[in-house]
């Protein structure tokens, strides 16, 4: 079975890579994919071999937490963690200002020994409370021979603190005796923690925006329902509803579960109510619901009220299926992310090695006189290196892109489908049920004597959608079972140049193969069982949400409504999302490639007296992560 499990405690790509590696190493788990931005793990496992409790225990051992308890709200946990993070950040700034005041002489303390001891106490308090999680996490990583961003922060601040503490008590005896000027760097150790915490606080706030789509979907389900018990109607928690229960839904309330209408009334119609299903199907016109009509959880009666029998509850509802599909898609990984994950696993050890080389280079070049410079250069390298930006580059863009698509009633199954969708240059579209609808104004007949326009109606905006696709350089091929004359009529009406008439399911499959042989990336759009072969074979299968379950199971993309303009929208969104991923990765890698040498003091080799200090290194590192998240959020504003 597949399950999306919230993960607490991840801070960088090395964290998510460690959790993923641990999960994949457990017996009974066939695959696991961890999403840093979504703070979740998509796990495919055999519940007879491994339980959620066992997974939780294993992950807790490496310093993280899986939220598996039904009574623990993920939102509450995240809110509590955010409040704690904010408190620690504010307090860390207080410690930072106090240490800066003492070390800079602003506090009026002229005795160097007293000033250093006071700075030591303040820095130690900051480390033990505000920075405690860095050291706990680093220790747990060390016991499992792994490393993450917390390892770099813990190592850099400990080095700066211990070197400063050594100088506080033995500086004059060791360095003064050799006429070497010495300093303390308590301000650096405090500011590193302060800037890292500030960065994480801003990052968490920004990441909330990437998850807004899924929260919006989850918010569509009400917390309570009105259950009918004889002549009385009682409001009860949604969790208490069972299959077969009779419920009452009034105008403006959210339908609590999927079910069947048993009675309805409204001001306009005595035996019908009208339900707004736009959030599910995208249709702006309220749907008429009479006795026997199906209603979906999350939809809202706009006129009248009705009673219904609960048929699907909890995880069985269509809304729950949509939420689960979006969560799984957001937790999936684009091909490039797997390379980033591999890089993340070696990133921290490589940075540690560079810091050690930096230290040795400065020390060997200048001897003991350059020891303070060597230590601070190594600390700056440890601090400025940022696997967080690399780890957030892909998942934040994916979360925004896939979430934005869901808001437009387009459900994308996974990241690979999104990647393929941007490459599409040929679209095959089934005519009946996809491009057209049966004409309800006349009695339907299969007689070919009726003109095409009397038998079917072109879907609203179908021609506009086809024109938009062609503007993007995409060729369209209409597939019809009609005779040549009728097929040509509908192709002309929809503005489609290429069409095939009298096609069978096998012909659609052969057409996909032919286009692929010509080097095209093919998307197939269909709604019926006779489209499933072509949907499965195409590079991207796109099913109409009102089609058959078989078609939707095979397809990588599901269009929830009848508005075909969602097809070009999906293509545009996929292109923007993938472009955003590469932008994020480019800047994340450029940041590390440029900043690490600058922190090491490489410019001094060329006579340029410039080097990034540990304090500024921590500020840059924090900014790099936040900038990646904010860049991804541009998708919400530009599409």
Model-derived features with residue positions:
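Flexible metal-binding regulatory segments at protein termini and peripheral loops
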Residues: 1-116, 216, 232, 320, ...
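Soluble-to-membrane junctions at the N-terminal ends of transmembrane alpha-helices
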Residues: 75-94, 117, 137-160, 323-355, ...
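Conserved catalytic phosphorylation-site environment of P-type ATPases
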Residues: 280, 339, 376, 386-458, ...
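Conserved ATP-binding TGD loop and adjacent catalytic N/P-domain core of P-type ATPases
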Residues: 17, 412, 422, 435, ...
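Membrane-embedded alpha-helical bundles of multi-pass transporters
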Residues: 108-111, 143, 162, 177, ...
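Transmembrane helix-loop-helix hairpins at the membrane interface
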Residues: 84-224, 342, 454, 612-614
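Conserved cytosolic catalytic loops of P-type ATPases
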Residues: 27-49, 53, 183-186, 215-316, ...
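Juxtamembrane coupling segments of multi-pass membrane pumps/enzymes
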Residues: 175, 188-251, 289, 411-413, ...
């Amino acid at each position: 079975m597949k399950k999306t499990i919230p993960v607490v405690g991840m801070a960088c790509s090395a964290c998510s890579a460690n959790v993923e590696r641990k999960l994949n190493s457990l017996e009974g788990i066939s695959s696991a994919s961890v999403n840093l931005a979504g703070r979740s793990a998509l796990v495919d496992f055999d519940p007879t071999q491994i339980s959620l409790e066992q997974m939780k225990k294993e992950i807790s051992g490496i310093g993280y937490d899986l939220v598996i308890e039904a009574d623990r709200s993920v939102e509450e946990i995240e809110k509590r963690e955010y409040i704690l993070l904010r408190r620690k950040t504010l307090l860390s700034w207080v410690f930072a200002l106090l240490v800066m005041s003492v070390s800079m002489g602003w506090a009026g303390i002229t005795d160097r020994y007293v000033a250093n001891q006071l700075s030591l106490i303040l820095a130690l308090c900051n480390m033990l409370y505000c920075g405690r999680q860095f050291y706990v996490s680093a220790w747990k990583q060390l016991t499992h021979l792994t490393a993450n961003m917390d390892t770099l922060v813990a190592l850099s601040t400990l080095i700066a603190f211990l070197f400063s503490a050594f100088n506080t008590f033995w500086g004059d005896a060791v360095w003064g005796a050799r006429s070497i000027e010495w300093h303390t760097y308590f301000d650096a150790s405090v500011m590193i923690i302060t800037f890292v915490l500030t960065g994480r606080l801003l990052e968490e706030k920004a990441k909330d925006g990437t998850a807004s789509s899924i929260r919006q979907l989850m918010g569509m389900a009400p917390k309570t329902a009105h259950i009918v018990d004889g002549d009385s109607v009682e409001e009860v928690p949604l969790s208490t509803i069972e299959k077969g229960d009779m419920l009452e839904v009034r105008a403006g309330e959210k339908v609590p579960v999927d079910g069947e209408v048993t009675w309805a009334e409204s001001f306009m119609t005595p035996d019908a109510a009208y339900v707004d299903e736009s959030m599910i199907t995208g249709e702006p016109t309220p749907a008429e619901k009479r006795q026997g009509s199906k209603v979906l959880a999350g939809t809202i009666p706009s006129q009248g009220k009705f009673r219904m029998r609960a048929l699907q509850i909890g995880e069985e509802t269509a809304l729950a299926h949509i939420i689960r599909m979006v969560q799984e898609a957001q937790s999936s990984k684009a091909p490039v992310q797997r390379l980033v994950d591999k890089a993340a696993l070696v990133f921290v050890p490589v940075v540690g090695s560079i810091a050690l080389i930096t230290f040795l280079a400065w020390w060997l070049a200048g001897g003991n006189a350059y020891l303070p410079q060597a230590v601070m250069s190594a600390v700056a390298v440890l601090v400025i290196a940022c696997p967080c930006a690399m780890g957030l580059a892909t998942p934040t863009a994916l979360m925004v892109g896939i979430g934005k698509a869901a808001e437009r009633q387009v459900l994308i199954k996974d990241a690979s489908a999104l990647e393929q969708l941007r490459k599409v240059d040929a679209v095959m579209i089934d005519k009946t049920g996809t491009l057209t609808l049966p004409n309800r104004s006349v009695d339907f007949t299969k007689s070919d004597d009726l003109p095409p326009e009397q038998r079917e109606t072109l879907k609203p905006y179908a021609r506009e959608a086809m024109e938009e696709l062609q503007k993007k350089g995409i060729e369209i091929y209409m597939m019809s079972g009609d005779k040549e004359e009728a097929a040509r009529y509908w192709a002309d009406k929809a503005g489609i140049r290429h069409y095939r008439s009298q096609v069978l399911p096998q012909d659609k499959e052969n057409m996909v193969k032919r286009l692929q042989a010509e080097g095209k990336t093919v998307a197939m759009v269909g709604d019926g069982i006779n489209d499933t072969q072509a949907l499965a074979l195409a590079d991207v299968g796109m099913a109409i949400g009102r089609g058959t379950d078989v078609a939707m199971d095979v397809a990588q993309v599901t269009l929830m409504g009848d508005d075909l303009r969602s097809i070009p929208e999906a293509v545009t969104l996929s292109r923007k999302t993938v472009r955003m991923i590469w932008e994020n990765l480019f800047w994340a890698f450029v940041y590390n490639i440029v900043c690490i040498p600058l922190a090491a003091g490489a410019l001094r080799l060329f006579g340029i007296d410039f080097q990034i200090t540990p304090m500024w290194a921590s500020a840059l590192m924090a900014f790099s992560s936040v900038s990646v998240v904010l860049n991804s959020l541009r998708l919400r504003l530009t599409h």
